[in-house]
Amino acid sequence: MASSPCPPTCIIVLMDRTFMFVGALMGFAGVGLGAFGAHALKGRLSPEMLAVFETAVRYQMYHALALLVTAVLLTRTEGGRAVLVAGWSFTAGILIFSGSLYALALTGVTILGAITPIGGVALLIGWAALAIAAF
């Protein structure tokens, strides 16, 4: 019987580093996009589309922090599987929710707003998974 190349503890270490990296990267991008919105887009976008862009930045930043917390919780709690679900849900949620709002604000293509709720549901799943991990 062949042994697994990476035992479960190895997977947790890989995932906590992955979520730390993705969270830090999303935070970095959020700061840059926030500055871009405040300086380069003000006056170029309608007030409504600028508000959409700012909402995308805000949710990206909140969930970048949630990913960093998820990375820490992976090594500090017994709820490994639920914490993994939370991390991947936050990652997907940021990409879909904030990504679709950025695209909507920058292009004005309103159909892009139709996928935003999918990202919102992913973010909600992430928070629910963290709550489950507490037990």
Language-model region placement:
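Polytopic transmembrane helical bundles with strong interfacial aromatic enrichment
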Residues: 10-135
